[in-house]
Every structure is written in structure tokens, then in C-alpha cells.
Regions:
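Short beta-strand/loop motif that positions the catalytic acidic residue
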Residues: 189, 195-197
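C-terminal catalytic histidine-bearing segment of alpha/beta-hydrolase fold enzymes
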Residues: 216, 221-265
Length: 265
């Protein structure tokens, strides 16, 4: 029994280490970036939201994209994704939705703990945090007044919901997140919603027909694209050193589509 416990403990430690080190490549890319990154504290009500901001190196004022992170929290990949948005010419603002007194994503001991905490976040709190980020964006001197939202995984679902919450958005980019459940979830959407989905992500893919129906019935613009052979999380997985060919192709193709859509802001 002692040997079995030891082996189990080693396996858990190895898994935890793998999880911790899995985004070292993203951290390394971010550290090489020439762009300006900064942390700001966004205060609203009794909350202070730790927020990561990246600025593009451009001559003119730029649109702002609010980034809603995955269910794992504000990871190195999420920060690197924000930097990539800035490289494309956009100001990226990423609130750490796990912010709490004395805590943020980095405070959680492992991925499972972060997932559990995020899953318990009230939608009203999430939208209030995003509102604080949107208000901050509106005050930024280098911003041109155009605001969009994007989200990934859990954040993709929240991006869809935030489009219904904030009528000032110019666009919403939903990456493999669940869609609306009822008609009331889309009635206030005033911007186009663009979806990015993996063919091998049946859990989310199964929701697309219902989302299409709800959006069409409400007269809203919803344009989903499904990427062949890609799984859930392909924007992150497709950029990793060990990316599968399908995820890598989906990542690259989605980025090209996304950049073309961003130019409409």
C-alpha cells in the first residue's frame, strides 16, 4: 500500500508539473515581446480587478478588444494572446476574473482549483468586471472609441453573453464557447457575433444549430466557422510546440479570419 501511495503521489506530482510547465512556451514568447505591457487595478463597487493591458506599436489611435480568458484563469497563454492582438494593431485588455482580496489566478495551487473557482463565479459579477474594463477602455487616450469582446472556452460563452449585456460593442468573437439557451439571451445584441469552433469538439459543436436558430429568429448576425479536425481549445493547443497538425492549421486559419474581421472595427 505504501508503494502504491508513493507511485500515485509521484504521478500526481508529475501531472501537476506538466500542467505548470505546459505554457512555458507562451511565457517565453511574451518575454520577447517589444510591446508595452502593464497591470492596472480596476475598481468598482467593493471589487478590485487585476487587469493585464497590452498596447500596439502604432501611429494612430486603436480599437480596444476585451479578452475573456479560459476557464483556467488569466494564464501565460491568455497574456500572450493579448500580446498577439497588440501585434496585430489593437489594444488588448484582459481582466483576471479570479481577482479577489489578496488573490488572483496565480494564487490557486493547481488548474483544478482555478476551474472550480471560475465555475462558481456569478454571471452578474463577471459582467460587472467586464463593464469596469469597458469603462477603462473608453477613457484610454490611445483608444479610438471602438470596443469589441472576445472569449475562449468558458470565456467564449461569457463573450456571447456580454454581447447581449453591452450594446456598445462593435463585434463579439466567440472561440469554442457555448451559445445562448433562450431567445432572451440575444434580444439586446447589437453587434455581429463571429464563432470559431473545432470539428472534433462535439460538446460545443452540438450547440451551434440551436444558436443559429435563436440568432436567426431574433434577426441577429451570427457567423460560425468550423475548423476540420480541430479539438476544443485549438487556439492554445495549436500554438503549443507539440500541436497536432489539425489544431495548428485551425489556429493559423482562425487567426487569418480573425485579423480580417478585426479590420472592420
Amino acid at each position: 500500500m505504501k508503494l502504491r501511495a508513493l507511485v500515485f503521489g509521484l504521478l500526481v506530482a508529475a501531472f501537476s508539473m506538466g500542467t505548470t510547465l505546459a505554457q512555458d512556451w507562451a511565457k517565453a514568447q511574451l518575454e520577447k515581446s517589444p510591446r508595452h505591457h502593464e497591470w492596472v487595478d480596476l475598481k468598482h463597487g467593493n471589487r478590485t480587478v487585476k487587469t493585464f493591458v497590452v498596447y500596439p506599436e502604432v501611429k494612430t489611435k486603436a480599437p480596444v478588444v476585451l479578452v475573456i480568458h479560459e476557464i483556467f484563469g488569466l494564464t501565460d497563454w491568455a497574456k500572450n494572446l493579448a500580446d498577439e492582438l497588440a501585434a496585430a494593431g489593437y489594444i488588448a485588455i484582459v481582466p483576471d476574473l479570479l481577482s479577489a482580496p489578496g488573490k488572483d489566478t496565480s494564487s490557486y495551487p493547481d488548474q483544478d482549483a482555478a476551474v472550480k473557482a471560475i465555475s462558481a463565479l456569478p454571471a452578474a459579477q463577471v459582467f460587472a468586471d467586464l463593464d469596469a474594463a469597458a469603462e477603462y477602455a473608453a477613457r484610454l487616450p490611445p483608444g479610438n472609441g471602438s470596443l469589441a469582446v472576445t472569449g475562449f472556452c468558458w470565456g467564449g460563452g461569457k463573450a456571447f453573453g456580454y454581447a447581449n449585456h453591452n450594446p456598445k460593442l462593435k463585434a463579439a468573437y466567440v472561440f469554442y464557447g457555448p451559445g445562448p439557451e433562450i431567445a432572451a439571451d440575444v434580444t439586446k445584441i447589437a453587434c455581429p457575433v463571429y464563432g470559431f469552433y473545432g470539428e472534433d469538439d462535439a460538446r460545443i459543436g452540438a450547440t451551434i444549430p440551436k444558436t443559429k436558430g435563436i440568432m436567426q429568429a431574433a434577426g441577429k448576425t451570427y457567423e460560425p466557422v468550423i475548423y476540420p479536425g480541430a479539438g476544443h481549445g485549438f487556439m492554445r493547443a495549436g500554438e503549443a510546440p507539440d500541436a497536432s497538425e489539425a489544431n495548428r492549421k485551425a489556429h493559423d486559419s482562425a487567426w487569418e479570419r480573425w485579423k480580417a474581421l478585426l479590420k472592420k472595427l
